[in-house]
Design a protein with these regions (language model features):
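Domain-level signature for proteins that mediate thiol-based redox and metal-cofactor handling
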Residues: 1-142
Length: 142
């Protein structure tokens, strides 16, 4: 199995899996993200205790890429401090813009590395970054 097949499989698994797609009870933060160009629409909900992201989940609809990206991001940020989560977001967005190519710097992204070449499909970039921008907005506005 080649790397592209593994990446495609990971995206499909996360987009179909419901383990991060559910409403949270009494979230501390709730932020809606919308991509008007393709209709992706998510609401990201986060519980924070002592500056640590204790729990996160999302609800909404969208393409496989937006749904998988949201799920993978949530797996990454759970248990991290808010600052660590924002560092991960910044690294992810820099990777998407091809500003980072150093493999060691990208290790922090774990499974989200599957989106590294999404910029080769410009119409899909907004799908991949929706949850990440939504997280940034959620934290800024809280």
């Amino acid at each position: 199995m080649d790397l592209n097949s593994i990446y495609t499989q990971l995206i499909m698994e996360h987009s179909k899996s419901g383990h991060n797609k559910r409403p949270l009870e009494n979230p501390d933060i709730s932020e809606r993200g919308h991509n008007p160009s393709c209709g992706d629409d998510i609401t990201l909900e986060i519980k924070i205790q002592d500056n640590i992201i204790e729990e996160a989940a999302y609800t909404g609809v969208g393409c496989a890429i937006s749904q998988a990206s949201a799920s993978i991001m949530i797996d990454l940020i759970k248990g991290k401090s808010v600052d660590e989560a924002l560092d991960i977001v910044d690294t992810f967005l820099s990777m998407i813009k091809k500003e980072i190519s150093d493999e060691e710097e990208l290790e922090i992204l774990e499974d989200s590395i599957v989106f590294q070449n999404i910029s080769n499909m410009p119409a899909r970039v907004k799908c991949a970054v929706l949850a990440w921008h939504t997280l940034k907005e959620a934290v800024k506005s809280s």
